[in-house]
Amino acid sequence: MAWPLKLGGVVALLIYLSGCASVRLDAGFDEVKASVEERSKAQIVWNSGSDLDRQVDERVRSLLAGKLTADQAVQVALLNNRQLQAIYSELGVAQSDLVQAGLLRNPIFDVAVTFPTSGGRADLELTAVMNFLDLVYIPLRKRVAASRFEETKLRVTGAVLAFAGQTRRAFYIHQANEQMLELRQTVVQALSASVEVARRLHEAGNISDLDFARQRALLESGKLALRSAEAALSQSREQLNMALGAWGKATEWQIDRRLPDVPVPPMETEASEKVAIEKSLDLDGMKQRIIAAGEQLGFAKATALVPDWGIGTRGERQEGPFSVGPILEFPIPLFDQGQGRSGRAAAELRRAQQEYYAAAVRIRSTARSLRDRMQAAQDRALYYRDILLPLQEQIMNETQLHYNAMQIGVVELLRAKEQQIETAVAYVEALRDHWLARTDFALLLSGRLPEGSGVQVGQTEK
């Protein structure tokens, strides 16, 4: 009876060691937080129902009470958006998988009682079996789960940075819509004054019905453009509200109604490809996916022939006293020799490797494309600001003088006004495009491919 006692002692020790494993649902968040702060200069907090949450709420209210800048809007969104809080829970899921990978499977305890049909004493059989091969396979499973946990941390970090970039884009789009609305309001006011003057001239017989109708048509077109600008502003405000996690009185925030001018000096673009590759969370995540796929292949090969090996004890009582003996259980690999599992793991490893190389090419191409796009948008905005806008203003002033001197007709005057309006609209659009391109370029250099640039960490099923 000595060996069953020793076996029982080993089982008890394993049960004790397994019971020591625990799950920290916030595991890995400190690393994510540090990486986000280093890459974006913004802070994130995982709500825990503590005093820290109240401090965060107070900070959010304080920021929303003032006039928001783009940086402040991003900070509010990172602190206040509930979707981000849900994303952080992915860390707890991955940590739970890592803990689970380090646990032994529970022993199987079986009891069988048979009653002789002729009467007499019942037969009793007790069996306890445990898969001790788990002791060999646990390190392999843990390495796979650890790589996936690292990938999850990178994916969550990338999701936070992407969300910050989306919030910044929403801010600039809304700010451009504010400026566009202000422009359209100014245009309608000016056109209304022009129509009123034209009305008096028409009543006095100094301009024809056709010229007066053209003035009115231009005003009505301006009013229609104003309504479109109001609708666009309402939509962009709600987009920003969603990003900020704002509702109720919190939606009464204000921002500057004009886009900032093109910054001087411009954003540094030297070695952008190198920086994008070195900082890429997408590539780092794919490296972890390759590591996990390699570990999974090793695990599949190791368990191909003998995935289970049960060792246990059996006690049986029939007519006499209990008889006790060992049990050894293992599958005989006659049909399933793990070919499918090994082949799948090898294919997933090859896929992960090829995706990594494809992503590296995509990141380099995106860096060049965004650099050129940002430079083109900047040149376009500066060209409108420094050349076309002053030129259109000069043309409008000269046209007005010629019209007042009755040297040209109302058609030429209206055409000059339309050109001036369209140039101003184009300038706002060019300035908006510059800030959007700058946001995407900065996001790439912080380590995340902008939305629409291709497959990112976590998009491919494992």
Predicted regions and their residues:
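Amphipathic alpha-helical coiled-coil segments and their boundaries
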Residues: A70-A73, N80, I87, N131, ...
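Short segments within alpha-helical structural elements
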Residues: S192, S221-G248, E355, A359-I363, ...
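Periplasmic alpha-helical coiled-coil/stalk elements that build and connect Gram-negative outer-membrane
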Residues: A21, I138, L154-V275, R373, ...
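A small-residue-enriched
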Residues: A21-I44, Q75-D134, R237-A246, E273-G340, ...
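Amphipathic alpha-helical coiled-coil scaffold segments and their short linker/junction regions
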Residues: L63, A73-N80, V144, E151, ...
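Terminal intrinsically disordered/low-complexity segments used for targeting and assembly
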Residues: A2-V76, E230-V275, A442-K462
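Soluble, cytosolic/nucleoplasmic coiled-coil alpha-helices used as oligomeric scaffolds and tethers
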Residues: D97, L104, V111, R155, ...
